[in-house]
């Protein structure tokens, strides 16, 4: 995958602000030292790839070894208070009461019409404390939504975390790398979706066994004053390479994961977005969350469209490509790329309910030409979460 293709993938998320107004993460100078090509993304100057590494090579390195990703542009929050669980359950469809301490779940903030304001990871630290990570591009509307609804809950406090970087380390050799770096902690007891506070050079860091590549790995919330030291120490291990936004996008697409603003948005419900699994069993019965009327109805009756995967012949499909069956437009591609792992053109998008079954033949229009395609299961590649 070349740089121009990567930039087209990232264009919908990129900031239009002048470079002088773009924010920088604590690792910005390290990116330059490592030979990064910097692009605007969600209001930040971010690395898209690094000198001497094609995006495809970076992708394959992460699948085979360990890749370091700067995700400090994402927003970190704490929600605290005796009504914290009730507050968060009022604005998400997740069953947070049942979530164990230092366990997490993928969730979504929903709006009054059942659409997704943003997708998010919610981690419970105790009955009154939650750590949340949201998308940088949704920062303003997330904050407005969180503050709007918190007024209904006495004693709940919202903190937007400042002064901390967020670093993801992903790939099959990651656990060994991290264990070598911090030998006094047994990371084998930390399973996928779990988190723990870990000391690194005298400071408290939050290690979450999670990520957005389909591989085993960690996301580390770390004070910015030691973040460069932490990242540099990891990169000193020959098994670790810095990986940019280009490969991050192809990795998450192979893993069948959504990119907010492309694959899901304010109009997409969790049900039609094939995210019904984030809706807790108890919540399906009780409802009571914003947008539950539409969402519960779609659970019962089915949505009009569904997010599915496609294999496309000959050329890669891109965001906005029309999906046709028997000459009728029945859907649209939301993400697509050549898969470095499979050597095939993969895509995800929406297709009318009834045509969403695996094996359904279709055609996808790319540059005004129709190309054969087929509905397939996601993820496109096997995932390797540590469970």
UniProtKB/Swiss-Prot annotation:
Principal subcellular localisation of the protein: mitochondrion
**Keyword Protein biosynthesis attributed:** no
Residues annotated to bind substrate: 219, 248, 385
Q: Name one GO cellular component term.
A: mitochondrion
Which principal EC class is assigned to this enzyme?
Answer: transferase
- According to the UniProt entry, what is the EC number of this protein? 2.1.2.10
UniProt xrefs under InterPro entries: GCS_T, GCST_C, GCV_T_N, GcvT/YgfZ/DmdA, GcvT/YgfZ_C, TrmE/GcvT_dom1
Q: Where does the UniProt annotation place the signal sequence?
A: none
Keyword Cell cycle among UniProt keywords: no
Q: Which GO terms describe its molecular function?
A: aminomethyltransferase activity; transaminase activity
* Catalyses which reaction(s): N(6)-[(R)-S(8)-aminomethyldihydrolipoyl]-L-lysyl-[protein] + (6S)-5,6,7,8-tetrahydrofolate = N(6)-[(R)-dihydrolipoyl]-L-lysyl-[protein] + (6R)-5,10-methylene-5,6,7,8-tetrahydrofolate + NH4(+)
Gene Ontology biological process terms in this record? glycine decarboxylation via glycine cleavage system
Q: Which SUPFAM superfamilies match?
A: Aminomethyltransferase beta-barrel domain (SSF101790), Folate-binding domain (SSF103025)
So what family is this one in?
A: Belongs to the GcvT family.
- How is the quaternary structure described? The glycine cleavage system is composed of four proteins: P, T, L and H.
The record describes the protein's role as:
The glycine cleavage system catalyzes the degradation of glycine.
Recorded protein name is Probable aminomethyltransferase, mitochondrial
């Amino acid at each position: 995958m070349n740089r121009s293709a990567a930039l087209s993938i990232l264009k919908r998320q990129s900031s239009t602000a002048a470079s002088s107004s773009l924010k920088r993460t604590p690792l910005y100078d390290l990116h330059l030292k490592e030979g990064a090509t910097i692009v605007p993304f969600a209001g930040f100057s971010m690395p898209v790839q690094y000198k001497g590494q094609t995006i495809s090579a970076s992708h394959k390195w992460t699948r085979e070894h360990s890749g370091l990703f700067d995700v400090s542009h994402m927003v970190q929050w704490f929600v605290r208070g005796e009504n914290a669980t009730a507050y968060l359950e009022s604005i998400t469809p997740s069953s947070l009461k049942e979530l164990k301490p230092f366990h997490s779940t993928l969730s979504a903030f929903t709006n009054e019409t059942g659409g997704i304001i943003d997708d998010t990871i919610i981690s419970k630290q105790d009955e009154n404390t939650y750590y949340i990570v949201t998308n940088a591009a949704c920062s303003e509307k997330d904050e407005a939504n969180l503050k709007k609804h918190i007024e209904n809950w006495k004693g709940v406090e919202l903190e937007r975390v400042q002064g901390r970087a967020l670093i993801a380390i992903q790939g099959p050799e990651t656990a060994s790398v991290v264990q070598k770096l911090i030998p006094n902690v047994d990371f084998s007891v930390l399973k996928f979706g779990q988190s723990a506070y870990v000391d690194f050079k005298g400071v408290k860091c939050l290690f979450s066994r999670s990520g957005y590549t389909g591989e085993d790995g960690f996301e580390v919330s770390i004070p910015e004053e030691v973040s460069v030291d932490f990242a540099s120490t990891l990169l000193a291990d020959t098994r670790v390479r810095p990986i940019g936004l280009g490969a991050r996008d192809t990795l998450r697409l192979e893993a069948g994961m959504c990119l907010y603003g492309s694959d899901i948005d304010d109009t997409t419900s969790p049900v039609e977005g094939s995210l019904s699994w984030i809706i807790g069993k108890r919540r399906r019965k009780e409802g009571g969350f914003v947008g539950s009327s539409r969402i519960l109805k779609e659970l019962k009756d089915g949505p009009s469209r569904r997010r599915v995967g496609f294999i496309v012949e000959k050329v890669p499909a891109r965001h906005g490509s029309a999906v046709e069956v028997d000459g009728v437009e029945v859907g649209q591609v939301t993400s697509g790329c050549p898969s470095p792992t499979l050597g095939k053109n993969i895509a995800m998008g929406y297709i009318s309910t009834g045509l969403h079954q695996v094996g359904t033949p279709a055609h996808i229009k790319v540059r005004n030409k129709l190309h054969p395609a087929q509905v397939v299961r996601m993820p496109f590649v096997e995932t390797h979460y540590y469970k």
